[in-house]
Regions:
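HIT superfamily nucleotide-processing domains
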Residues: 1-128
Length: 128
C-alpha cells in the first residue's frame, strides 16, 4: 500500500482540503508555495496514463474548484498544475499557487510550521 493510500485511509495524518467518492485532496507536505495542494484519485494508480476516465475527470474537475479556492486564499494570479510522479509512485496532480514561472520550481519546496499549514488549510476550505 502506498503512502497516499495510507493518507486516504486515515492511517497517516494529512491536512485534508476536499474529499468525494472518487478523489482526495490535501496540502503537500513540502510546500513549493504556501497553499500547494495535491489532488489524487482514491484508486491507487501509478501513472496518469493508466488512471480510469472517471477518476481522471473527477481529479481535474475538483482541481478547478480547489484551484479557485487557492487563488482566493493566497491572492495569487495563477495556480499551476503539474503531474510529475517521481517521488511517490501514485498519480497525483500538484496545484501550486504562482505569481511567475519560477514560482513553480520544486527546488522551492520546504516544510512549513503546523500553524501555517492549519491556517492555510482552513482558509482554502473556507473558499470551497
Amino acid at each position: 500500500m502506498s503512502l497516499f493510500s495510507k493518507i486516504i485511509k486515515g492511517e497517516l495524518p494529512s491536512y485534508k482540503i476536499f474529499e468525494d467518492e472518487l478523489t482526495f485532496s490535501f496540502l503537500a507536505l513540502d510546500q513549493v508555495n504556501l497553499g500547494h495542494t495535491l489532488v489524487i484519485p482514491k484508486t491507487e494508480t501509478n501513472h496518469w496514463l493508466d488512471v480510469g476516465q472517471k477518476e481522471y475527470m473527477q481529479v481535474h474537475l475538483n482541481s478547478q474548484k480547489i484551484g479557485k479556492a487557492i487563488m482566493k486564499a493566497v491572492n495569487c494570479p495563477r495556480v499551476g498544475q503539474i503531474v510529475a510522479g517521481f517521488e511517490v509512485p501514485y498519480y497525483h496532480l500538484h496545484l501550486i499557487p504562482a505569481w511567475s514561472i519560477p514560482d513553480l520550481s520544486f527546488t522551492r519546496a520546504k516544510r512549513r510550521s503546523e500553524q501555517e499549514m492549519k491556517e492555510i488549510q482552513k482558509k482554502i476550505i473556507s473558499f470551497l
